[in-house]
Amino acid sequence: VKRPMNAFMVWSQHERRKIMDQWPDMHNAEISKRLGRRWQLLQDSEKIPFVKEAGGLRLKHMADYPDYKYRP
């Protein structure tokens, strides 16, 4: 069972598509670096919708898998 996405992952899922549309030949590593820099530059107020969505995903995950324990 996969862990639920955190706020960065929720946001980056949307943003990655935009970058790939603009630069389809860009390597995944470069896209990830750009996403990391962009996330750091976002204001906390801009992150709120993604934090809320990630919280909802976490709650749903807890309800769906009540005995889940992360084991790397």
Curated annotation (Swiss-Prot):
Protein name, entry field: SRY-related protein ADW5
GO cellular component, one term: nucleus
Signal peptide: none
Any one GO biological process: brain development
One Pfam family it belongs to: HMG_box
Subcellular location: Nucleus
Recorded GO MF terms: DNA-binding transcription activator activity, RNA polymerase II-specific; RNA polymerase II cis-regulatory region sequence-specific DNA binding
Major location category of this protein: nucleus
Taxonomy, superkingdom: Eukaryota
